């Protein structure tokens, strides 16, 4: 038996100590051991033991047990959310999987080896005892980590027929770790791909989301397509393979979508942007027409077709209605910034209304992904920087009398008659506030208004015009500052 010295948090070792003190074995197992051996920080910590669920619960003050697999959630006193709940599971033997989703029955075992041989991949079938440093590796997982390969424990066909989601999980882990899928395991995926139809869309969605949020989603989806399982995740993507585009693009629609997605991942952008990037041109195959006049392919209206298709795809994947609405909106309007003749400040204000203030920057980021996905080298050419400046300009709060903590109706209540003098007073007040923002209080402005109300029309108009000119000057300076920020004139 090998040994190793791996760094394990005290909260986790304390749970193992409690199990051993109670007379039971306790090993870390699965992804946390794999990650420790690789040098990654584990996101989850799993303990396996020969104690039964009721024995585990008897050892710890606060637990919950709400599943058919024996897994007990142990609530710790740690403030760190990573260790707040640690799962402790008895060694187990699983019976037949008649539905390719879950075992027909689960039996608990007293033997660690029984538990390790039921696991999915060799790199996840290594157990580690923190106290002694013992490393139990019966299936060559440590060697596969060195080789950077993903291989099933035992026969691939049997493992995938037990739980077909393991095929998608292999692709996901390959993207997270940048490991290759071993040849026999790959062949097993090809042979068993159709079994994915039996998996609930919620479970498929969860694995897909983890793929999309990994550092290498483009690589993962390429592998999924080559192994024949992409069609059981988002079949519409396969329709984009080999669909040539116009001369502005270097790649077919499929590769363009994957490259757009990868840029979103490289930028560590949100799931919404990643899904929008993956699906933004999904309508192109259906909208493609040859133009004799242009001697090129056209895709008029593909954003409308794509938005409809994306809505259906996202519903099928059980994506939340709120997130789906955001993604569909981004896809529907993603062509807005592609036509410089249409992009006026008023048009930008309208598009902000269409996609929402909270999502306009996401639309710009999607445009960046779209551009990078064409194979063009520049991420932010002058035109895109100009659009960003226009968005900032359209969204900023204008310098105006609306900034004041007093309005025309209040001035009338103070005794001034409705008419042009109201505007002069407001602009005179604005100039003072622009000089000293501390004066923008209701108390000060009411007091100052009473003074201004005593002035003759000519003097008050002069002060008002000065304030108005000052507002226009400051407003223009603010706009120029925004343009300077984005390096546009």
Locate the predicted segments by residue.
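Catalytic cores of the polymerase beta-like nucleotidyltransferase superfamily
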Residues: 1-489
């Amino acid at each position: 038996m090998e040994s190793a010295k791996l760094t394990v948090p005290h909260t986790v070792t304390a749970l193992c100590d409690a199990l051993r003190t109670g007379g039971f074995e306790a090993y870390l197992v699965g992804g946390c051991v794999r990650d420790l051996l690789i040098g990654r920080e584990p996101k989850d910590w799993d303990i396996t033991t020969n104690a039964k669920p009721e024995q585990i619960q008897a050892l710890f003050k606060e637990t919950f047990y709400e599943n058919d697999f024996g897994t007990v959630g142990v609530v710790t006193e740690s403030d760190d959310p990573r260790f707040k709940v640690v799962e402790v599971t008895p060694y187990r033997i699983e019976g037949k999987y008649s539905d390719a989703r879950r075992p027909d029955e689960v039996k608990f075992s007293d033997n660690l080896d029984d538990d390790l041989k039921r696991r999915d991949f060799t790199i996840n079938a290594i157990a580690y005892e923190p106290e002694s440093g013992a490393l139990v590796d019966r299936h060559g997982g440590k060697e596969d980590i060195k080789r950077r390969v993903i291989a099933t424990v035992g026969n691939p066909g049997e493992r995938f027929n037990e739980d077909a989601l393991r095929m998608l999980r292999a692709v996901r882990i390959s993207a997270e770790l940048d490991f290759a899928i071993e040849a026999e395991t790959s062949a097993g995926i090809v042979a068993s791909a159709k079994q994915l139809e039996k998996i609930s869309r919620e479970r498929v969605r969860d694995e897909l989301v983890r793929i999309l949020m990994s550092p290498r989603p483009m690589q993962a989806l390429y592998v999924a397509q080559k192994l024949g399982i992409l069609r059981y995740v988002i079949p519409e993507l396969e329709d984009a393979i080999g669909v040539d585009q116009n001369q502005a693009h270097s790649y077919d629609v499929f590769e363009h979508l994957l490259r757009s997605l990868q840029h979103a991942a490289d930028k560590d952008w949100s799931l919404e942007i990643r899904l929008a990037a993956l699906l933004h041109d999904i309508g192109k195959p259906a909208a493609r027409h040859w133009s004799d006049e242009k001697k090129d392919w056209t895709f008029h209206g593909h954003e409308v077709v794509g938005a409809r298709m994306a809505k259906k795809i996202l519903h099928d994947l059980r994506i939340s209605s709120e997130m789906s609405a955001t993604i569909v909106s981004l896809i529907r309007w993603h062509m807005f910034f592609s036509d410089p003749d249409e992009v006026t400040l008023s048009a930008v204000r309208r598009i902000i209304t269409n996609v929402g203030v909270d999502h306009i920057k996401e639309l710009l980021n999607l445009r960046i992904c779209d551009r990078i996905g064409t194979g063009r080298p520049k991420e932010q050419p002058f035109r895109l920087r100009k659009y960003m400046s226009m968005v900032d300009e359209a969204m900023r709060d204008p310098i105006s009398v609306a900034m004041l903590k007093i309005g025309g109706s209040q001035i009338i209540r103070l005794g001034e008659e409705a008419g042009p003098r109201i505007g002069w007073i407001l602009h005179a007040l604005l100039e003072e506030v622009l000089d000293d923002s501390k004066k923008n209080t209701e108390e000060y402005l009411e007091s100052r208004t009473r003074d201004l109300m005593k002035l003759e029309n000519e003097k008050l108009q002069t002060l008002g015009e000065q304030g108005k000119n000052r507002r226009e000057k400051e407003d223009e300076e603010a706009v120029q500052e925004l343009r300077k920020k984005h390096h546009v004139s």
